[in-house]
A protein has these predicted regions:
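Short beta-strand segments
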Residues: 284-286
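Conserved acidic residues
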Residues: 281
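Non-heme Fe(II) oxygenase catalytic core, chiefly the N-lobe of the double-stranded beta-helix
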Residues: 2-278, 288-356
Length: 356
């Protein structure tokens, strides 16, 4: 029988799932776990028995994969009709862009059969790293954190040499809920400024991967995103990713630093570092109001990362499309970009909600 228990320190926003048998799990049972994950934000499924192929078959039942870099790439080059090889072969595309595309391909991107599942690994084949975030620890971050239309969920399946490393989680909802009504109202109005800062997520990252992270994390300088947003399940928390936030709109640099440091101090207690117990553990987590990090020995470590929308769960949980923001013009900017991304992903046979 499946056993579900709370993860320590996360104040009810995280669960362990044990004794799950994917070979005999019904579709309804799996979808129910998906709805639970949306509401709990962090789910750690121990000892899954999944490999990269079965992982993709299972996780895509919750939602379609999305990589904003790939979608916006095709929007910039519509004549390529979604064919990355045409972009690489074109004389109209800069060599810098081509290097980033090749890096994205090398770590598993641009592969529709696997849902753009990316490898996270320091392993090398013929002297080349086969995955992104190859070496060392990763500092607190969320993916696409400086993108107004960030992808809201991440699934990470272990594969090889995982048990000397940890993945940590920081949930922001309990901190936000602990504040006074007046302070929450102040935070609700605040806008953070995001920029890509080399080395802020993975100190010592090699140049090609740094360029890929720039496109992935914060493609446009001085992007404005509200501090307080809601998760796909409607949970309010902070979209405060340490790796891309460089200031608060309307505040001086010194005041921003003091304010953001106070937030970091308040959030620090709502963290949990999961030291992988099995190579095939599966971690599924919110990417809107939760940050994550990596600790420990990453030598020859290999895992698979699937980034996705809750395409087949969203209406079951909230009865409406997911829009993180209540403030304008950010709500409209999100809708516009999501419609553009949805249009570009039609070439992959994907159908995203039309936002109005």
């Amino acid at each position: 029988m499946i056993r579900i228990t709370d993860i320590p320190n996360l104040e009810g926003y995280g669960v362990f799932v044990d004794n799950i048998d994917f070979k005999h799990l019904s579709r309804q049972e799996w979808m129910d776990l998906g709805k639970l994950q949306m509401k709990k934000l962090v789910m750690i499924i121990r000892s899954t028995g999944l490999d990269s192929r079965s992982f993709h078959q299972v996780i895509k039942k919750w939602g379609q994969d999305r990589q904003n870099y790939a979608a916006t790439l095709f929007a910039r080059y519509p004549w390529a009709n979604g064919q990355v090889d045409q972009i690489i072969a074109s004389t109209e595309v800069s060599e810098e862009e081509k290097k980033i595309i090749r890096e994205f391909q090398r770590v598993g991107g641009c592969n529709q059969k696997t849902g753009n599942t990316l490898r996270v690994s320091g392993k090398k084949v013929n002297g080349q790293r086969i995955g992104m975030f190859a070496d060392g620890e990763l500092l607190w971050h969320s993916n696409e954190s400086g993108d107004i239309a960030f992808t809201p969920a991440v699934a990470l399946l272990g594969a090889e040499n995982m048990t000397n490393s940890a993945t940590g989680f920081m949930v922001t909802a309990p901190y936000y809920n602990s504040l006074s009504d007046s302070f929450r109202s102040e935070l609700d109005e605040m806008i953070l400024i995001h920029n890509f800062v080399p080395g802020k997520i993975n100190p010592g990252l090699n140049e090609p991967q740094d360029n890929l992270m720039y496109k992935n994390m914060c493609p446009d300088p001085d992007t404005e995103i509200p501090l307080v947003i809601q998760s796909p399940a409607g949970i309010k928390g902070l979209h405060y990713s340490f790796n891309t936030v460089t200031g608060v709109k309307g505040m001086s640099k010194s005041d921003s630093v003091r304010f953001l440091n106070d937030l970091k101090w308040g959030l620090a207690k709502y963290t949990y570092d999961y030291w992988w117990e099995n190579d095939d553990d599966l971690l599924i987590f919110d990417n809107s109001i939760v940050q994550h990090r990596r600790l420990g020995d990453t030598t020859n470590r290999l895992c698979h990362r699937y980034q996705f929308d809750y395409t087949y769960l969203q209406y079951k949980v909230t009865k409406q499309n997911y829009i993180p923001y209540s403030q304008e013009p950010y709500r409209s900017r999100y809708v516009d970009k999501m419609n553009m991304i949805g249009n570009m992903l039609k070439h992959e046979g994907k159908s995203f909600p039309v936002f109005v």
